[in-house]
């Protein structure tokens, strides 16, 4: 028994497959079993050899299932099914061209320094996606639902008045929500607000905002996404605002370990349900000056490697010695979008936007 135990430990340490069987029955060893009944011992050993061979063959069959050849049919089926799940345009035409049509299944991470407009950019894209008839599921960790709604309606007032050069009628988010100000508005200003609300209501049915009250982490994002698919039968574009304030995956993990687990889980959600997941990320303090780079993303290791698309926003001229604080005071601001990584397309593409901070609006230049 002791010898068998030592052999077992030795085989385990060498990672050699084995199984245990006692062919001796109640006899103390093989010699005693042979003397007692040669025929029975021989049959027992032959059966053990047969069983070992069967187990080995089964192990081989299981391993060979990993051969890529076994997945060709599934691969072809995925191509066929993609006809019913085409890419989803963001509504920013130049960005869609750079992304080969729009959003596909995968993990998209977009980052920028504080207060540069990353949430506004993504929520404008979300509105444009919803306008086209697609569902959008937004996990908002900081902003309340009412804040996001006010920003969208403010943007609608700007878009309604821009063609005729009447943007003086457009209203900021605060101008929308501050009821006392309505006493001072002209009737035509109020009509713009009411029309903007109607415009927003027409596509708001496709937008689902989950506020970050309580513990919202990767597990809750998966559960909510799966519930949405189960109830509506539609795969949404999932947006997380933002990564670094999601609930920790494990309280005992370091910040980096938690970020690694969260990013990997978001990647799995996109893969398991064949949908785009967009995560907004903050930058580390060391990256507040100079051009945007992959290593700028806070706790960036897994973000950099696991994301399918990595996008950075920066003030135009960030490669030069500019005063970021002064640039942030401008309205509109010239903002550059840089595609830092694209697993299935071109990288290094830079797109220029005009960001109207008053009315939460990005336009491509």
Task: Show the residue positions of the predicted features.
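P-loop NTPase motor core
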Residues: 23, 28-29, 33, 39, ...
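Short, well-ordered coil/turn elements that cap or connect secondary structure elements
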Residues: 13-15, 202-204, 272, 304-306
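NTP-binding/hydrolysis catalytic cores, primarily Walker-type P-loop NTPases
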Residues: 58-62, 344-365
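Phosphate/oxyanion-binding loops and surfaces in catalytic or ligand/nucleic-acid-binding neighborhoods
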Residues: 14, 37, 48-51, 55, ...
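Cytosolic-facing regulatory segments adjacent to core modules
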Residues: 134-233, 297, 350-352
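TOPRIM fold recognition
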Residues: 1-72
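C-terminal anion-handling pockets and recognition modules
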Residues: 339
